[in-house]
């Protein structure tokens, strides 16, 4: 499990790491009723996810190597005091974070009422964290610090892995529900249901056949009219579609065409007046028409070019000419 999440636990805590993340540590639907009943106590944090359950899981992960946690809890007969281990974990500054990550895992896939209850328990845990000051501090036991930090991160990643299939399934079901709703709506519209959603037998016998025949005749007439119009104007419609597809947005030149015009501008900055031959070449290179090219150069010269004082006035743009906006 450590390798799966790219974590490396301390040597004294790694052997039993899989116990913390095993499926047996999560709640099943059969456990929800017990959770609802046990949540009536005054301290639901301790009753539901306190020393009894979460600490037992953590201690199980530590029991085989717990003798190396700190010298003061070693015994000559090599028997580990689980009570001392639980106390050290519960007093660690990272324990509230471990509890929160554990509750987040339990909330994945839980029914709404269970999820709400777990959120209340989590809020009570936040209040409990503010009232209780941990009796230990970081650095007092580096190996325990690393254990707590590692498994907090593992639980966060584990919760993400648990939530992913639930999120994908929820998205899929929502799409299916929307498709079914649209399908049912389309069927009801096609059948022409009444205001209360029920078609009376009188309507079916008297008006149903007439309406179906009328709709069928109307569809045939529409199809015939469409075929005649396509035969008569099909070529013209194709030509118009081609022209519309080639037409550029008004005042907005393609980026490649604008770059080609800028390249020509930079090369002829001293006299940026393209000849007719230059305009034809630019039109072939950019796909623009003569009017677009003329407008671009007029705007470019008005905005970014100032003729020298000794330049003949006749060679300049006519000051009364039209001003076109490119963008």
Curated annotation (Swiss-Prot):
Transmembrane segments: none annotated. Residues 245-308 bind DNA. Residues 224-244 form the ELK domain. It is found in: Nucleus. One of its GO terms (cellular component) is nucleus. Pfam families: ELK, Homeobox_KN, KNOX1, KNOX2. It comes from the Eukaryota. Induction: Seems to be repressed by AS2 and AS1 but induced by STM, CUC1 and CUC2. Expressed predominantly in shoot apices of seedlings, and, to a lower extent, in rosette leaves. Signal peptide: none annotated. InterPro entries: ELK_dom (IPR005539), HD (IPR001356), Homeobox_CS (IPR017970), Homeodomain-like_sf (IPR009057), KN_HD (IPR008422), KNOX1 (IPR005540), KNOX2 (IPR005541), TALE_homeobox (IPR050224). Belongs to the TALE/KNOX homeobox family. This is Homeobox protein knotted-1-like 6. It comes from Arabidopsis thaliana (Mouse-ear cress). The gene is KNAT6.
């Amino acid at each position: 499990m450590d390798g799966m999440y790219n974590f490396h636990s301390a040597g004294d805590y790694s052997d039993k790491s899989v116990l913390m993340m095993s499926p047996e540590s999560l709640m099943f639907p059969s456990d929800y009723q017990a959770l609802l009943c046990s949540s009536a106590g005054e301290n639901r944090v301790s009753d539901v996810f306190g020393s009894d359950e979460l600490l037992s899981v953590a201690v199980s992960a530590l029991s085989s190597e717990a003798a190396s946690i700190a010298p003061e809890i070693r015994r000559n007969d090599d028997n580990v005091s689980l009570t001392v281990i639980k106390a050290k974990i519960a007093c660690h500054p990272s324990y509230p974070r471990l509890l929160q990550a554990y509750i987040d895992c339990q909330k994945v896939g839980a029914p709404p009422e269970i999820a709400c209850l777990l959120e209340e328990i989590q809020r009570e845990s936040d209040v409990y964290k503010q009232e209780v000051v941990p009796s230990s501090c970081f650095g007092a036991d580096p190996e325990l610090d690393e254990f707590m930090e590692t498994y907090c991160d593992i639980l966060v990643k584990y919760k993400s892995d648990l939530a992913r299939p639930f999120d994908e399934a929820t998205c899929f079901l929502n799409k299916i529900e929307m498709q079914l709703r649209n399908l049912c709506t389309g069927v009801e519209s096609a059948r022409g249901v009444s205001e209360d959603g029920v078609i009376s037998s009188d309507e079916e016998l008297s008006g149903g056949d007439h309406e179906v025949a009328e709709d069928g005749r109307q569809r045939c007439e529409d199809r015939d009219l469409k075929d005649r119009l396509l035969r008569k104007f099909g070529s013209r419609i194709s030509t118009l579609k081609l022209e519309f597809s080639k037409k550029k947005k008004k005042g907005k030149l393609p980026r490649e065409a604008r770059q080609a015009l800028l390249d020509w501008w930079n090369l002829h900055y001293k006299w940026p007046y393209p000849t007719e031959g230059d305009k034809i070449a630019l039109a072939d290179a950019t796909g623009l028409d003569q009017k677009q090219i003329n407008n671009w150069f007029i705007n470019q010269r008005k905005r970014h070019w100032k003729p020298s004082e000794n330049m003949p006035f006749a060679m300049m743009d006519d000051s009364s000419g039209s001003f076109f906006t490119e963008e």
